[in-house]
Amino acid sequence: MTELAQMKCEACQADAPKVTDAELAELIRMIPDWGVEVRDGIMQLERVYKFKNFKLAMEFTNKLADLAEEEFHHPGILTEWGKVTVTWWSHSIKGLHRNDFIMAAKTDQLLD
């Protein structure tokens, strides 16, 4: 279990700080399978998970939904045949918060 995956998300308000460039560089190394995307000027974490069929992709999606509810932090999820695209960002600050990296690490653990 990674250090990030052991952490809990904290409440993120609109005035919470986004991760700094230095924090981003440190945190992204802890989740090497994730990439950083910028959409509409908003930095986001994204990963595509591959599965053998739609049913397995859907099972993963449902596990992720349960995790998101437990942590009160919710991703963008696109479930397709054989793959699930997961995108994490903090809506309230329109960017990346430490919570997003925690949730990315926790998402990876759903495969175990």
From Swiss-Prot:
GO molecular function, one term: 4-alpha-hydroxytetrahydrobiopterin dehydratase activity
Organism expressing this protein natively: Shewanella loihica (strain ATCC BAA-1088 / PV-4)
InterPro entries on file: PCD_sf, Pterin-4-alpha-carb_dehyd, Pterin_deHydtase
Protein's UniProt name: Putative pterin-4-alpha-carbinolamine dehydratase
EC number: 4.2.1.96
TM spans (from-to): none
Pfam families: Pterin_4a (PF01329)
Catalyses which reaction(s): (4aS,6R)-4a-hydroxy-L-erythro-5,6,7,8-tetrahydrobiopterin = (6R)-L-erythro-6,7-dihydrobiopterin + H2O
Keywords: Lyase
